[in-house]
Amino acid sequence: KIPNILKGGLKSICKHRKYLDKACAAI
């Protein structure tokens, strides 16, 4: 569903932006 590069990038963002926790959980 999500390209690995984008997925990895989102995970990195999740570590720094807690407000994305819900989006991160969906990954």
UniProtKB/Swiss-Prot annotation:
Q: In which tissues is it expressed?
A: Expressed by the venom gland.
Q: Which GO terms describe its biological process?
A: cytolysis in another organism; defense response to insect; venom-mediated perturbation of biological process
User: Its Gene Ontology molecular function terms?
Assistant: toxin activity
Additional remarks = Electrospray ionization experiments give a mass of 6598.6 Da for DELTA-pseudomyrmecitoxin-Pp1a heterodimer (subunits A+B).
Q: Does the record bear Nucleotide-binding in its keywords?
A: no
Its localization reads:
Secreted
The protein's UniProt keywords, in alphabetical order, are: Disulfide bond, Secreted, Toxin
This protein's name: DELTA-pseudomyrmecitoxin-Pp1a subunit A
Asked if the keyword Cell membrane belongs to this entry, the reply reads: no
- List the GO cellular component terms: extracellular region
Q: How does this polypeptide assemble, per the annotation?
A: Heterodimer composed of subunit A and subunit B (DELTA-PSDTX-Pp1a); disulfide-linked.
Question: What role is this protein assigned?
Answer: This heterodimer has insecticidal and cytotoxic properties. Induces immediate paralysis when injected into blowflies (Lucilia cuprina), and then death within 24 hours. Also inhibits the growth of Aedes albopictus mosquito C6/36 cells.
